[in-house]
Amino acid sequence: LYISIHVNAAFDKKASGFEVWYLSPGYRRTVIDENTVEDKSLATILNSMLEEEYTTESILIAKYISEGLEALCGNEMNNRGIKQEEWFVVRNANMPSVLVELGFVTNQKEATLMTNDEYLQKMSNGIYNGLVQFITHFEKSRGFTGL
């Protein structure tokens, strides 16, 4: 599991909110190098299976983190939702991965919030609670084989 935590910036100083990104399902990364297996067609099949699993898990992680942040920070900051993109930080992770943008440093109100220790603790608790929800879901479904 790979979680990259950032703060956002925009030319529009009114841009606001937190958001969670996952890798676009259409992007296919190579998890298993074809040169490490005898049967190259097997590597293709395994890569496809792993990518499908990683995408499913990444979407769920993004959902649960977004919900965790919403529960603790939604009164003070806009939830921009979960989104997909081929960001470098998630594209090159050979595991389930998400990018969490905690707010906009170019927005005066949010920049001030993100310098407040109590608010930062709320945000970290929101992320933590989302991860607990994901792990609980994962363990109940035994690795999503039941999906």
Regions found by a protein language model. Give the residues of each.
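Active-site-proximal helix/loop segments of hydrolytic enzymes
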Residues: 1-147
